[in-house]
Amino acid sequence: LTRRYFDATVAGDLGEPRTIRNAVCMHEEDYGVLWKHSDMFAGSHETRRQRRLVISFFTTIGNYDYGFYWYLYLDGTIQLEAKATGITFTSAYAGDYATEVAPGLGAPYHQHLFSARLDMCVDGIRNAVDEVEARRLPVSAENPYGNVFRQSRVRLSTESGAARLADNGRARAWHIVNLESRNRFGHNVAYALYPEGQPVLLADESSSIHRRAAFATKHLWVTRYDPEQRYPAGDLVNQHPGGAGLPAWTAADRSIDGEDIVLWHTFGLTHFPRPEDWPVMPVDYAGFTLKPVGFFDRNPTLDVPPSASGHCHGGVDGPYEPPRVR
């Protein structure tokens, strides 16, 4: 296993550049089965192993430690996994709003909400976003047994109309399509954003956090690309009365149909702490996945070679050695 580490330069407490040695790690790892099929008639069996390139770093923010892991897969899938660990915030136990994690010690209910700024360029910069979901159909002459359902597709054409919530009950996803590039079936090439669909911000609309972190009230925002728009809550969150960032930017309601666009995806955890999270919390996970949809004409991993046949053996006395033939 080969690993590479990269330094990162960040802003220090006083705004000066500060270099963190070996801040980012990159390595490749096995990830189980890529694809497999056993043909009972021909007696053939084919299996290919999945590998992924991992780009990761950890950051400590107060009492919590967060790991951010980008996974790049052989089939074109891109995944982000956020890992939350560290020490939960505690106070005197309050039964209605916290979990007692030690005698008289409570860990309040809370959320970890992140915003991923996804500057998309799906086979070019002229992209658009379609909201795609399952649509149930009533029994009819076309659906006499009530078994079929359809795929609904709606173009999100303006910034204000693209502030959306996930809906796992409909398998809702967002397809980022290229309007100028088509696959062999004549369809626009695309990548799909698959959300986990966890709750967005639960704080009341009158709260200061709701005003300052309005980005966290939606799973999806889409804006025209602007290099000055980097932070979803604006530049000065703690000093702002609210409304900065995405709510202000999308108020212009610009067209995002066939433009250079940025997707902002809110994802995270709603954490009801457990006694097992104390005194240090085992990692909990959140994230999202981007998958090619018609971006390739077929499975792009058909040329992955089979693994060498072999078996792993081991024990307290060292590796297994087969008996010698005398």
Language-model segment annotations:
Residues 1-77, 83, 90-96, 101-326:
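Extended effector regions of multi-domain proteins
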